Regions:
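Substrate/ligand-engaging "lid" and interaction regions
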Residues: 1-6, 10-390
């Protein structure tokens, strides 16, 4: 098998697997859910629906999967591969380390380069994996690991959306995806050459590219999700058309654009043009994406390095006041979603310990620091507008 995809979720099937199939590159998924792995093997194919462009819809044939628990089969597949992709969610990256380590140890005996490409919406995912493997790999394979294994990162710009019930009844593996085909990968950490994969674009100055995507797309998504939830919206596209939300969103775009322009020396006009691609995606009515999915786990999304607080810290670093990001942070602190255990924990913390506790324990910010005071100012403003009721 030329490629292995660790994970078989919506992005794994609807983006990575889709592009590999169109590139005629053989691959196998590795999946933790036995039932999903078995279903992929039983059906042997799945449908990728391109939202808004149905003529590009595709049936991915010859789909195969290995159970995550079948360690020997997984590590054999890694040892035979040229490229391993990960699409498991950042929280699960450490679970991959033992499999990657053993697979690399096996591959060190047969030789050839191996590149591991993370497809995660997470901070420094390739570093997490490389550090984990470095700590556990056997002495005999260390030289091979250092010289023949690349661990690098991709930015995933395509969204994978749960299909509706009728489509899932016809094909339980079907994925609805955005009509976006570019697959940017950090060129600096690749060893040797990658196979020719449709859409793959090697980016030499990747740090700037990654931050540009994160602080533009993720900050905008967080803003739309949490402010949209506060105003009673269920769908991202509906919220992104509300003039009240758009005013805040445009402010967030300007704040992050100014900071990114200063940090990476992009022309401001170029960065503002890039924000339009983010807004277009959020407002795309063909992408039926729910706020509940995007706002899920608000405790993580209020973390100091995540989409809102992380963006606000970047903005402050470059001498810009993050007024609109502070509104988004304030909205996130008042997010309510019964059934979301982290949202329920956040509500409990807010009601029992107060906003200062969230700033301190969740956001890791001084409640009386510049950002902490600004967020509290915006909470008062949202109450004044009647958007927050206590």
């Amino acid at each position: 098998m030329k490629c292995v995809i660790l994970g078989a979720g919506k992005i794994a099937r609807g983006f990575v697997g889709h592009l590999l199939f169109l590139s005629k590159i053989p691959f196998a998924f590795v999946e933790k859910s036995d039932s999903l792995a078995d279903m992929i093997n039983e059906r042997g194919q799945y449908t990728v629906n391109i939202l808004g462009n149905p003529q590009k819809n595709c049936v991915v044939r010859g789909a195969k999967a290995i159970r995550f628990s079948d360690v020997e089969a997984v590590t054999d597949a890694i040892a035979e591969a040229e490229v391993v992709f990960t699409s498991v969610g950042g929280k699960n990256l450490k679970d991959l380390v033992p499999l990657l380590t053993e697979g690399i140890e096996k591959k060190s005996k047969t030789g050839g380069n191996l590149n591991v490409i993370t497809c995660e919406n997470w901070k420094l995912p390739a570093t997490v994996l490389r550090n984990g493997v470095e700590e556990t790999i056997c002495e005999e394979a260390k030289e091979y690991f250092e010289n023949h294994v690349g661990m690098t990162e991709a930015v995933i710009m395509r969204s994978g959306i749960e299909a509706d019930k009728e489509l899932l009844e016809m094909d339980p593996l079907i994925v609805n995806v955005q009509d976006f085909w570019e697959f940017p990968v950090d060129a600096s950490r690749i060893v040797g050459e990658l196979p020719p994969i449709l859409g793959l674009k090697l980016i030499p100055e990747f740090t700037g590219f990654l931050e540009r995507k994160f602080y533009t797309y993720n900050a905008a998504n967080g803003t739309t999700s949490f402010v949209g939830a506060l105003l009673g919206y269920e769908k991202i596209a509906d919220a992104a058309h509300d003039e009240r939300i758009l005013k805040i969103l445009d402010g967030v775009y300007m704040e992050t654009a100014q900071a990114l322009s200063k940090k990476h020396h992009f022309p401001l006009e170029e960065q503002l043009a890039f924000t339009l691609t983010s807004k277009k995606k959020l407002q795309d009515d063909t992408i039926v994406d729910f706020i509940e999915r995007n706002a899920r786990d608000p405790i993580r999304k209020l973390g100091k390095d995540d989409r809102l607080v992380g963006s606000a810290r970047l903005v402050l670093e470059y001498g810009i006041r993050p007024d609109h990001l502070a509104i988004a942070i304030a909205a996130a602190m008042y997010y309510v979603s019964p059934g979301d255990e982290f949202a329920e924990k956040l509500v409990k913390m807010r009601e029992e310990e107060g906003i200062d506790a969230i700033l301190e324990k969740v956001c890791e910010q001084d409640p009386n620091g510049e950002l902490g005071l600004l967020v509290k100012e915006k909470i008062a403003l949202l109450k004044e507008w009647g958007w927050i009721h206590e």
